[in-house]
Amino acid sequence: MKGIWGKIAGIVLGMLCFCIPLWSCAMFEASDKKVSDMDFTVVNPEVLSEEIRKMIEERKKDAFQMAYHDGSYSYIIVGYGQQETSGYSIAVNDVYQGEDGIWVDTDLIGPEKSEKTEAAASSPFVVIKIESVDQTIRFKN
């Protein structure tokens, strides 16, 4: 009888050890609730340092998100990976202060059906400049 209760207690304890971390993740999910708007500028990648341009070049084949801080400004870079043709662009829908960090909302926009595209692959990305922040940057895309 003692052996059965020991096995049952072990199973229950194992289930709790597995489920509690899952519950805690669900309880602390990031909130994208807007607190205030933020000023931002979409910048030409050519104004970035050679170091950052090299980091983008290394990552742009796959989708990526990164931030770079130079003291005065934070640069948020979102790339959508390699696309089969040219003609893609990226819309920056919103950049705002949320309850738990800075939120960035972007969308990849494909070429219009009537638009002439080249068969050459492209790797669209956007660089967003905001005043320097010491907060987590989160992405909605």
Positions of PLM-derived features:
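Exposed, flexible binding/inhibitory loops of compact, secreted disulfide-stabilized domains
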Residues: 3-11, 21-141
